[in-house]
């Protein structure tokens, strides 16, 4: 059975009407008024869909068995008659990104769809479907069937990781944030802005700033990162702590040479061999010579100029906050800009950034931490999302300062860990970040209920 959102694939007994955009409140209400069946299957892409054997029966039976609000499934990408399995991830409490990947179809029981659309606020042009999904999730489970129940031809689903920082999408993101903030209030996970200033100088430190570089096997880039850190200038003392996670490609030897000629350079090799990036960060921030502020520099990247650390320190001192996050420019290995260019996270506001941070997939870079705070929180020992987890935990209680000009250059190249992710790796990363959000939402609910310190 072939179906499609494209009108040229229509059938007899089908009602055709124009809706623009598909995700608006009015479009969803029009669908609800027009549908007189027991179930509604939404095709949320422009692909041609072919259901597999007994797929409809499989989905519809589970819709009642689990009182499911929404059902989605894994699928095949079909190209030139070749089928490639495409697995998705399970929906959980923290699956609140507006670009969560449901694949190409979402399956609803009509009675639940009607209930949700009747509660849907009028006027959303872009966030209607997002609001519908969040509202359904409050009352009903959202179920993934880990079976390939259809194939999709053309228009592969792409999770647009930087939509929330693209100025062209500002109107979209304002709606999404409004919907999400309302959702947090409904589930008692909304928090008020932290207002207390930190006493940044109640403790003594040998250095004001430490640049922390976790590294493993970055022979090609580590020298540039080290030189970028050591070239910083400012009205403070600083050092560089490189946590070398047992590199075996020559990186260790390069670092030993560089450390000999720089008294402010600490080359640290952890005792343990089971550390990921988060664990290496913990080694750095707990080092006896770590400065008052610990500032990120990835082993692939460099600071924009010699004033990056000074700009970060200025924000700490002015705003008396626990964390400062800058903006960065995306480039290739030769420093040529690549889309979307500058990532500045202007979606962040002092009034609601700490709530909206649960909706987006990252906080920005470079990230800098007030060392006594990050020593209490620590990073999870993982190599993806460790910074996001720490940032969310800090935002729960403390202010976060922002710098909206690019002070950091993030390079994408064939050896970079974020390049050319497989479906499996991308699913692993997304599931983990959703789990971080799940835990954070639960903690904030407990805080609001007076059950968590």
Where are these predicted regions, by residue range?
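Short, acidic, metal-binding catalytic loop of nucleotide-sugar glycosyltransferases
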Residues: 2-12, 227-237
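Glycine-rich, basic loop-to-helix element that forms the pyrophosphate-binding segment
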Residues: 22-35, 271-289
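Short beta-strand-to-loop acidic/aromatic patch adjacent to the donor-nucleotide binding site
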Residues: 36-50, 291-302
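A conserved acidic beta->alpha catalytic loop
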Residues: 47-49, 244-254, 273
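Conserved donor NDP-sugar-binding/catalytic core segment of glycosyltransferases
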Residues: 53-85, 307-340
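Short, flexible, basic/aromatic active-site loop/helix in glycosyltransferases
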Residues: 79-103, 340-360
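Acidic donor-binding loop at a coil-to-helix junction in glycosyltransferase catalytic cores
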Residues: 122-132, 383-390
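Catalytic beta-strand/loop signature of glycosyltransferases that borders the donor
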Residues: 143-150, 327, 401-407, 411
């Amino acid at each position: 059975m072939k179906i499609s959102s494209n009108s040229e694939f229509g059938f007899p007994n089908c009602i055709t009407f124009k809706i623009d955009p598909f995700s608006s409140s009015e479009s969803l209400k029009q669908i609800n008024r027009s549908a007189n069946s027991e179930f509604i299957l939404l095709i949320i892409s422009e692909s041609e869909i072919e259901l597999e054997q007994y797929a409809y029966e499989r989905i519809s039976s589970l819709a009642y068995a689990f009182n499911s609000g929404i059902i989605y499934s894994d699928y095949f990408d079909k190209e030139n008659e070749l089928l490639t399995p495409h697995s998705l991830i399970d929906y959980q409490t923290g699956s609140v990104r507006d670009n969560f990947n449901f694949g190409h179809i979402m399956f609803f029981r009509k009675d639940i769809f009607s209930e949700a659309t009747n509660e849907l606020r009028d006027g959303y042009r872009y966030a209607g479907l997002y609001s519908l999904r969040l509202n359904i999730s409050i009352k009903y489970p959202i179920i993934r069937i880990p079976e390939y129940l259809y194939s999709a031809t053309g228009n592969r689903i792409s999770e647009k990781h930087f939509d929330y920082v693209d100025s062209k999408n500002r109107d979209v993101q304002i709606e999404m944030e409004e919907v999400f903030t309302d959702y947090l209030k409904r589930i008692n996970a909304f928090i008020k802005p932290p207002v207390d200033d930190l006493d940044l100088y109640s403790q003594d430190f040998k250095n004001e700033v430490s640049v922390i570089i976790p590294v493993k096997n970055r022979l090609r880039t580590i020298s540039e990162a080290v030189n970028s850190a050591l070239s910083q200038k400012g009205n403070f003392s600083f050092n560089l702590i490189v946590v070398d996670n047992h590199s075996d490609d020559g990186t260790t030897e390069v670092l030993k040479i560089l450390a000999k000629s720089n008294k402010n350079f600490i080359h640290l090799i952890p005792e343990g061999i089971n550390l990921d990036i988060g664990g290496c960060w913990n080694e750095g921030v707990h080092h006896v010579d770590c400065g008052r502020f610990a500032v990120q520099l990835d082993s692939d990247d460099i600071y924009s100029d010699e004033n990056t650390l000074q700009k970060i320190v200025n924000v700490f001192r002015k705003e008396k906050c626990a964390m400062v996050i800058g903006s960065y420019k995306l480039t290739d290995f030769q420093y040529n800009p690549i889309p979307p260019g500058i990532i500045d996270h202007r979606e962040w506001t002092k009034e609601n950034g700490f709530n909206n941070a649960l909706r987006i997939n990252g906080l920005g870079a470079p990230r800098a931490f007030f060392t006594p705070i990050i020593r209490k929180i620590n990073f999870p020992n993982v190599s993806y999302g460790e910074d996001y987890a720490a940032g969310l935990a800090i935002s729960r209680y403390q202010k976060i300062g922002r710098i909206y000009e690019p002070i950091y250059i993030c390079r994408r190249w064939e050896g970079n860990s974020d390049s050319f992710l497989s479906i499996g790796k991308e699913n692993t990363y997304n599931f983990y970040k959703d789990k971080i959000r799940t835990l954070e939402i639960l903690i904030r609910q407990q805080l609001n209920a007076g059950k968590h310190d």
